[in-house]
């Protein structure tokens, strides 16, 4: 056999092996890099501490807390619509644990944010009131029963009261920021006064950026003199007007104070929404 032919064949074999080796190495490197980029920080069994890096007072009793994750590419690892358990100290120095829903998604790498309404007698509210930049918060999770896949429903109706807006905002963001998810979102958000409305700027941003997919109707118990939203409590008529009608491909989400949740459950039942069409956070 021609010696030159054998040498050429050997070179081709070696080149093929080299290319295959490089491809495997590149694939492994990509996998490792991707895994590193998507480092999940939550532990469902054990509390982990995260450093407070920013605190922005939104009103006299509401603040946004920004917590740093271990690396700039870390993610919290929180499924859409689920929450975390936060541990702190009350005014007597006793441990207290309470659930909260971050307003950030896993697309917000390197950090997570909590918008907290602090009540005068709230035990965990005391802990957040006392928190300063540089302090750490103990967090465990994820927690919750809500599960969602893009396009699972044609539309969501959302009934939120007060700080119950946080899981709604998280779900709405996840839907609207996913270009392949065409689910429509109809939100009714109830508060006592105009100043009680949480995430107002962010919600208005969603209506501006997604006008055909996201609709919001505000309801105030004590509205200002000039007001074009709802007045009083969320009624059956408001739900009929601003939420999708009962159907197998819609779901109504509820999150608010216990009296509101109870009243909304009764309103929804009277309007023909089956238990399968509803979910309460």
From Swiss-Prot:
Topologically, how does it sit relative to the membrane? Single-pass membrane protein
Q: Which GO terms describe its cellular component?
A: endoplasmic reticulum; mitochondrial outer membrane; plant-type cell wall; plastid
Q: Which residues cross the membrane?
A: 13-33
Q: What is the effect of changing residue 78 to F?
A: In cbr1-1; decreased stability and decreased activity
GO MF annotations, alphabetized = cytochrome-b5 reductase activity, acting on NAD(P)H
| Positions of the FAD-binding FR-type domain | 45-149
According to the lineage, what is the superkingdom? Eukaryota
Modification type Phosphothreonine: residues:
166
Sorted alphabetically, the keyword list is:
FAD, Flavoprotein, Membrane, Mitochondrion, Mitochondrion outer membrane, NAD, Oxidoreductase, Phosphoprotein, Transmembrane, Transmembrane helix
Put simply, this protein is called NADH--cytochrome b5 reductase 1
- What species does this protein belong to? Arabidopsis thaliana (Mouse-ear cress)
EC numbers for this chain: 1.6.2.2
